[in-house]
């Protein structure tokens, strides 16, 4: 299971409660505490909760459980003016791309470490070791628009991340650790996917490695996130998780227009999903005799909301697939520690022979 290391002082600041309370409540949002030492806590989270891959996502859930913030988190989207033109040659290689811009950021080294950790956890989980989805992070101030997502020959060269000299795409796949590890995602391709800007600067060779020219540092104020892959649904999920995390970091989110032939679409999609409100099922599944008003309050403590007869589920909650999942969220919002276990009466009483 994935593990994330969190600085407790940062988490105190993000949630607004002391460390003692944090350590008491972490298990009640579904996290297992692995260790506490040197001012940090290592927590294990379920792969179906990738939004817990940073302290920002964990703090968001804790603020709900503690009643500090209720209901859907709100992230405003504005037009960034950034566009990506997609090469039709990638239709059989790695056809999907979606992006988001986050501006107004003030990053420290721990922010960057956590973003990279989230990136890698998403690669391994939803990304299926980058075969299905891969993510790139870029300093947008170093990019000249528009951008191009192209299929280029194996002989094309650029300077990969953390390298000082140019390497061809073919050499990267054969001679670098990351290339050998993930080259299987491009087996059989006659052209390789590359993201470049209008000046020819390489942002990324997905799903292998980013370019060195657009690396993110503590001086970066505006990040461009690209998500490429073979499955649109998984790519949209991953981008929603990353966009909401950048929103929690204080970033102003901007849309990116993706142009593929005559098709145009705007990403990311962070609109909440809707599911039926079924208070009777909640009572049946949880065993809690809650009024509908109490059910709604528990839903809001789990950072969801209710409108009419619909439960509004934040887009980053990719784990909620069924009404039973909503019932589980009600139990978490109610407080697992408040639920008293009862042994069911047996209708098969034993007897001595």
Features from the language model and the residues they span:
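Mobile "lid/hinge" segments at catalytic clefts and subdomain interfaces of large enzymes
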Residues: 78, 82-100, 104-118, 122-270
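Extended, well-folded interaction surfaces typified by the phenylalanyl-tRNA synthetase beta subunit core
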Residues: 2-99, 114, 131, 275-278, ...
């Amino acid at each position: 299971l994935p593990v994330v290391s969190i600085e407790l002082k940062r988490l105190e600041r993000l949630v607004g409660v002391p460390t003692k309370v944090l350590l008491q409540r972490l298990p009640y949002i579904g996290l297992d505490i692995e260790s506490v030492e040197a001012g940090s806590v290592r927590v294990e989270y379920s792969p179906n909760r990738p939004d817990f891959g940073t302290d920002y996502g964990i703090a968001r859930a804790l603020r709900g459980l503690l009643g500090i913030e209720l209901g859907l988190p709100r992230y405003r989207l504005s037009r960034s003016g950034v566009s990506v033109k997609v090469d039709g040659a990638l239709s059989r290689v790695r056809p999907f791309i979606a992006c988001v811009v986050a501006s107004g950021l003030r990053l420290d080294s721990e922010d960057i470490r956590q973003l990279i950790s989230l990136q890698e956890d998403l690669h391994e989980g939803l990304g299926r070791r980058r075969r299905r989805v891969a993510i790139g992070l870029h300093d947008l101030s170093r990019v000249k628009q528009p951008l191009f997502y192209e299929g280029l020959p194996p002989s094309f060269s650029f300077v990969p991340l953390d390298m000082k000299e140019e390497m061809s795409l073919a050499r990267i796949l054969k001679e670098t650790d990351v290339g050998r590890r993930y080259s299987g995602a491009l087996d059989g391709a006659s052209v390789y996917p590359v993201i470049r800007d209008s000046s020819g600067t390489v942002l990324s060779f997905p799903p292998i490695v980013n370019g060195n020219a657009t690396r993110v540092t503590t001086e970066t104020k505006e990040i461009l996130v690209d998500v490429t892959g073979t499955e649109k649904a998984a790519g949209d999920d991953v981008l929603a998780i990353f966009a909401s995390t950048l929103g929690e970091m204080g970033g102003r989110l901007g849309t990116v227009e993706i142009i593929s032939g005559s098709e145009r679409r705007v990403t990311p999609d962070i609109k909440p999903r809707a599911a039926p409100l079924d208070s009777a099922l909640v009572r049946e599944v949880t065993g809690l005799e809650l009024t509908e008003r109490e059910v709604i309050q528990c839903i809001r403590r789990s950072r969801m909301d209710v409108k009419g007869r619909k439960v509004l589920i934040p887009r980053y909650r990719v784990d909620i697939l069924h009404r039973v999942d909503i019932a589980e969220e009600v139990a978490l919002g109610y407080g697992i520690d408040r639920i008293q276990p009862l042994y069911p009466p047996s209708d098969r009483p034993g007897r001595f022979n």
